């Protein structure tokens, strides 16, 4: 989504699955080449809020054929080459959180590459798990919920940090309407809907 916005896609409000993508559009961070490497100034900085929190989960196909129960067990299975795991590419947030989990367990991605399959986004990873093409996958709690997948473990903040979804209004001719909608998304009524699909308030 960040790339589409950067390339000029029509967008009034952006909710990102990680701060990294929002930072790259935030003009208040121009000069910080790590956070905003292209010097973009596309969001209304004052509108930016941390809207939601998600969890990074370990999910399994129906029946859990490998009997996977935890990230601890997954780490051992990966090191022994005894599991097929679906993960997101390193340029998407779910993949970035996964690499933090690998780092936490001292797993070298290249050393276990033959036991990994990749998705260009979290939906592709979810599909691989749903179809039983892999033994397990690392996806968000919300995606597991919508696909009716079994979650066997959730990553802690220590393992991969918190999964915060920032939201911000994009600069343009619809800033007032987008700001009103963003305010609505922070109400109790909206949060009830978010919580029903696996999110929590940030």
Regions found by a protein language model. Give the residues of each.
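GST-like domain detector, emphasizing the conserved glutathione-binding G-site
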Residues: 36-39, 48, 65
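Exported/periplasmic ABC-transporter solute-binding proteins
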Residues: 2-6, 18-19, 25-27, 52-54, ...
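Early extracytoplasmic/lumenal segment of secretory-pathway proteins
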Residues: 1-36, 42-44
